[in-house]
Amino acid sequence: MCIRDRYYLGPSPAREGQVIGSAGPTTSSRMDKYTPEMLDKGLKGMVGKGKRSPEVIEAMKRNGAVYFAAVGGAGALLSKCIKKAEVIAYDDLGTEAIRKLEIENLPVIVVIDKDGNNLYETAKEKWKK
């Protein structure tokens, strides 16, 4: 099994002519329980919003993975970057189903790099002054 990248989202239903409905990021920490194992099996990139646990950050460093943040509240705009969406598991979960997505030019920023440098922490220190 090849696990490459994950975008944590719960899209709204697609309207006629749309690939997917509004597709903004969801809180990534809800997946922290499962993430270290996925990283150990080959996951290299994650897109979502919010902080990650110390266990996830350690697993990212161990596996050379990166965590990107997408802007919350911009789901309608972000959905335009999704060129193809296919439900591949748990169709009965509706918007929470697992999808294979083809994405182009998704505007994200690196918030935790492969070395564990964490923008959420460094920015807090910088702007505290």
How would you name each of these model-derived features?
Residues Y7-G50:
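Ordered, amphipathic secondary-structure segments that act as subunit-interaction surfaces
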Residues S12, G50-R52, A65, V71-G75, ...:
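Short, ordered loop/turn segments at secondary-structure junctions
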Residues D40-K41, M46, G50-V66:
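Hydrophobic alpha-helical bundle architecture
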